[in-house]
Design a protein with these regions (language model features):
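N-terminal helix-turn-helix
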Residues: 27-61
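Hydrophobic alpha-helical segments within soluble ligand-binding/sensing domains
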Residues: 178-181, 186-216, 254-261, 280, ...
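An alpha-beta-alpha
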Residues: 200-242, 346-361
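Flexible loop/turn connectors
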Residues: 13, 187-188, 260-363
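Alpha-helical recognition/docking segments in bacterial nutrient-uptake
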Residues: 2, 12-16, 24, 34, ...
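Short acidic capping loops at alpha-helix termini that bridge into adjacent secondary structure
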Residues: 25-27, 213, 244-248, 293-299
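Short, solvent-exposed amphipathic alpha-helices that sit
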Residues: 91-107, 198-201, 224-243, 282-286
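Short beta-strand elements in bilobed, periplasmic/extracellular small-molecule ligand-binding domains
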Residues: 105-121, 215-216, 234-256
Length: 363
């Protein structure tokens, strides 16, 4: 049997909710009887709590009306920690990072950025835990985290980091991707591009260009968002009455010519969708070395619309993510969590757009 909740615990809870604007100035606190029933305590216990809050100038009890919050909030400046390790590999995280920093200058929060943006995924893995621990020790008000990818045991490490932040009672918003805990419900807010739609859009584009068979190429230990893109591709291909099976999935190093050779390419009828632009750029070079002509034998495209994409030998068709909006909505969700960190988790998927270039058009 659970122990009786003390009046101090109830007092601390209500006071915290007032300070976090769960009960903003001018709002009514729950009736004493309602709160007594919620906490399974007597009505005089709640009356004692409300009297203490009134003595501190946080509320005003009015007979026949109720208890009104009178506390006027000051312009609190929050401190948020950034854990965006992908900024060392992809431009999208640099854009998201810059937007968060830009908004911090104009908003009511400051950002701590410890980095972990090294080009090597393994180095980022070594750094990320210490940065997370640093943020927790500094008692930041919230954390933005883009889960690690491209390293072994990334799933376990991501879950470990999220759990540590959660146990510290710090609000957390995941950016760009979820952590792999399916089929369990994710306990955190997530903001990303709509990856299922991104897969569907790219598949439809290549099919419309005359491709009769599509392949998907990605590197080992890629992010969970890859699964959603694959699902979107499969859905679109099957809607067109064609097959997309495990034989169309290639997980490996795009520099490995022997592995690249395993892809069945029917000249003028094959399209390759890569997990990102960096994979596509390397794969284009490998295909060229094998005598496979882009725009003649095969079409190819990627994701993230990196700056160099339009400067490749064959300018690369890509999918542009709404990076600045991802950052903006992430801030909104973290501010929401500051008011009540127990709110039901939200997943927001934003629309991106395809940027069509030479690499996805047969000549």
């Amino acid at each position: 049997m659970k122990g009786k909740i003390s009046s101090k615990t109830i007092y601390d809870t209500i006071k915290d909710q007032i300070h976090k604007e769960r009960f903003p100035q001018g709002s009514m606190l729950p009736a004493e009887l309602t709160l007594a029933q919620k906490y399974l305590v007597s009505r005089p216990t709640i009356a004692k709590v409300y009297n203490q809050l009134q003595d501190e100038g946080l509320v005003q009890k009015t007979k026949g009306l109720g208890t009104i919050v009178t506390h006027q909030h000051s312009n609190t400046t929050y401190t948020f920690g950034l854990l965006l390790p992908g900024a060392g590999e992809s431009e999208i995280f640099s854009i998201i990072n810059d937007q968060l920093l830009s908004q911090s200058e104009a908003g009511s929060f400051n950002c701590l950025w410890e980095g972990a943006t090294a080009g090597s995924a393994e180095i980022r893995k070594m750094l990320i835990e210490s940065y997370c621990e640093s943020y927790i020790n500094k008692k930041v008000d919230g954390i933005f985290f883009s889960p690690l990818e491209r390293v072994q045991d990334a799933d376990e490490l991501n879950l470990k980091i999220c759990t540590a932040i959660q146990d510290a009672g710090i609000p957390l918003v995941l950016i760009d991707r979820n952590i792999r805990i399916s089929p369990e419900r994710c306990a955190f807010d997530v903001v990303s591009v709509d990856n299922f739609n991104a897969g569907s859009v790219m598949a439809k584009h290549l099919l419309d260009q005359g491709c009769e068979e599509l392949h998907f190429f990605y590197r080992p230990d890629s992010a969970s968002s890859i699964d959603l893109r694959i699902s979107g591709i499969r859905d679109m291909v099957e809607k067109q009455g064609r097959l997309f099976t495990a034989n169309n999935l290639f997980c490996g190093n795009p520099e490995d010519l022997e592995f690249v050779k395993k892809m069945k390419i029917t000249s003028g009828k094959t399209g390759i969708i890569c997990a990102n632009d960096s994979t596509a750029a390397v794969l284009m070079s490998s295909l060229d070395a094998l005598g496979v002509e882009i725009c003649s034998d095969v079409l190819i495209c990627g994701y993230d619309d990196m700056k160099y994409s339009k400067h490749l030998k064959h300018s690369l068709t890509s999918f542009r993510q709404p990076c600045e909006e991802i950052a903006n909505i992430s801030i909104e969700l973290l501010m929401r969590r500051l008011k009540d960190n127990n709110r039901f988790p939200i997943t927001i998927n934003l629309a991106g757009e395809i940027v069509i270039r030479e690499s996805s058009q047969f000549l």
